[in-house]
Amino acid sequence: MIKRVALAFSLLLSSILPATAGDVNVPVEAYKLKNGLRVILSRDNAVPVVTVYMIYDVGARSEEKGRTGFAHLFEHMMFEGSANAPKGVHNKMVESNGGVFNGSTHPDFTDYYEVIPSNKLATALWLESDRMRNLSINEENLKNQKEAVKQERRLSFDNQPYNTAIVDVWPTLMFHNWQSSHSLIGSFEDLNGATLADVSKFFKTYYAPDNAALVIVGDIQNAEAKKLIETYFGDIPSQPIPKRPDLTEPADFKAVTQVQKDPLAQVPAVILGYPGPKRRSPDYYALHMIDAILTGGDSSRFKLDLVKGKESIISYEAELGWPFASARDYRDPEPYAMFLVYKPNFTAAQIVDQAQEEIAKLQNQPVDAKELERVKTLVRAGAIKEMQSSQNRAQALAQFELADGNAELINTELDRVLAVTPAQIQAAAKKYLLPEKRAVLEIQPAPAQAPKGGN
């Protein structure tokens, strides 16, 4: 399912990867099958478990007009059975072996994983290859999953505070290109209009070996894993690689403010967003550090100055890529955005000014070396904890491979973040985090209305 970011700093940590500078050493063996499937193996024999992670180069920003929500719908369809593993078999085979599985839709990717005992690696590979080869696409499955997606939207978005504003309204303010500005969840109208032919075309276009990467992390012998991968995936036909959508945004972003009434909100909130830098550019890493300074941990500036000092903010989230993803989940462009829930005795304008004042401090004076070192220590420690999960490592390897063409970047990203200087932080804050290049969405409580439905 698509998930809203819950704690942005934890996503920052998962974006920048583990260990101290110079100490990151994730084993990486990358190669490609004849049909174009990219494979990354990362051996870790600490425990007898493997993570099998399949990522497809298609996300919500790949969708066409009139077909919003297709990426998410197809994530659901992938669990409806395949030629040799009918509906329910995938779940049963993984869970009966003590494993777990899931899938998720991102702006630019869709991923699926199994975490399973290492002696059942062949089982997970067979399941993934069978649904890549021949997914069960029929009217019954399509109808069922249309309803499942609509019900998920009702429960998780339409009938939760703030979420409708976040998924439907916020992208229209932050982006001008339709590929990024449309609702990543999709509309009931488009879901209802989805035909079997539409879904079959989507599968054939995007769910092909040369539009995917397979990552295996854990207790494996690489030579044996390669034999299994060739057995299960080697003869799946490739397809013409789909053209990526043009995600270019206008260079002259102009400030915009909008007010949205929310009958489910008990207290007001405001979102601030700024167009961000190019992926993996020096400014990209500087903005990571800016976010950590502003919102990372109990000693962050927002926590000390706004939550405790002015006592105006109740809670906050922030991240490059907020709200639908972490920074790694996006190709360019990705904004830097923050979500601030505040006390009703303040106005939205006051909260916006307070947040911008904290940014102005970074623009007007280089961050103190002692504070920066403290933040880097926090980043380092959090990154180590984050990457103890083989699933997180697998996701990072997969996303670096698809977005950047190099899974081995997992071993250098932390160094780049920790190398950011006070001067780079100040320059990036001056370049990107400007009021005249800022989108603002004020979310105000409103009188209760009848619950939203849709069909």
Give names to the regions the model predicted.
Residues 1-4:
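Positively charged n-region of N-terminal signal peptides that target proteins for export
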Residues 126-131, 227-232, 351-357:
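Short amphipathic alpha-helices in soluble, non-transmembrane regions
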Residues 139, 146, 154-155, 200-232, ...:
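Non-catalytic, conformational "gating/processing" segments within enzyme and secreted inhibitor domains
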Residues 19-60, 86-120, 156-211, 235-281, ...:
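Non-catalytic beta-strand/loop surface segments
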Residues 6-16:
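Bacterial N-terminal signal peptides
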Residues 80-84, 132-141, 367:
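Short, polar/flexible loop-turn hinges at active-site or ligand-entry regions and domain interfaces
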Residues 59-67:
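Short pre-active-site segment immediately N-terminal to the catalytic Zn-binding motif
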